[in-house]
Amino acid sequence: MPGTSELITVAVPKGRLLQESSALFERALGVSPRKLLEGTRKLAADAPEAGLRFISIRAGDVASYVEHGAAEVGIVGLDVLREEPRDLYEPLDLGIGRCTVIVARPKGARPLPRGVAPRVATKYLSLAARHFAAKGVPAEIIPLHGSIEVAPSLGLADTIVDITETGETLRANGLVIEEKVLEVSARLVVNRVALKLHPERLRLLIEALRAAVAAADAEAR
């Protein structure tokens, strides 16, 4: 059994992904990050029997923790990884947290006149800019961090780039999906230095999770 100082630190995002990833860890290793973290007011909890320490942090910060070595392993949405590319090893699609980054506009809105750059409200500044640039469309990107769906109705934007799971919030705000930008799911990411320092332990962790993902997929069919 590894000592406390030898535990592999796994950064897990708060919210829905914590619950979904906990089911995978429980299947793979018999430990649930959610149950461990619920039992403490701290943002870290140890599972020495599995050689792991779990830390619960904001989803958007997981990649930074892993890239800079504060955690060896993390769970990150593909949207985060493609919005701001990181120097991380991505060995596994966990198949959880499935969503889609989309372009949406008001239902029944008339097309903009040729040559007029659309005003695009989004938190995905890079993804949106790259998407419209690839189409040869000059776009004015308006950065927002919340309530993006109301931007068109308030006259702030002509269209939005946002992430959706069911599309219900879009429909409730009178928006229709125009294009899909990126299919998203959560990925396992690993610090590249840690991969050299703990190759065998990380290989076993990755393979255990890979088997858990495969089993979950088989059950879902």
Curated annotation (Swiss-Prot):
The keyword Amino-acid biosynthesis applies. Pathway: Amino-acid biosynthesis; L-histidine biosynthesis; L-histidine from 5-phospho-alpha-D-ribose 1-diphosphate: step 1/9. Its main location: cytoplasm. Its EC number is 2.4.2.17. GO terms for cellular component: cytoplasm. InterPro entries: ATP_PRibTrfase_cat, ATP_PRibTrfase_CS, ATP_PRibTrfase_HisG, ATP_PRibTrfase_HisG_short. GO terms for biological process: L-histidine biosynthetic process. Keywords: Amino-acid biosynthesis, ATP-binding, Cytoplasm, Glycosyltransferase, Histidine biosynthesis, Nucleotide-binding, Transferase. GO terms for molecular function: ATP binding; ATP phosphoribosyltransferase activity. It is found in: Cytoplasm. Lacks the C-terminal regulatory region which is replaced by HisZ. Catalyzes the condensation of ATP and 5-phosphoribose 1-diphosphate to form N'-(5'-phosphoribosyl)-ATP (PR-ATP). Has a crucial role in the pathway because the rate of histidine biosynthesis seems to be controlled primarily by regulation of HisG enzymatic activity. PANTHER family: ATP PHOSPHORIBOSYLTRANSFERASE, ATP PHOSPHORIBOSYLTRANSFERASE ATP-PRTASE. Belongs to the ATP phosphoribosyltransferase family. Short subfamily. NCBIfam families: hisG. This is ATP phosphoribosyltransferase.
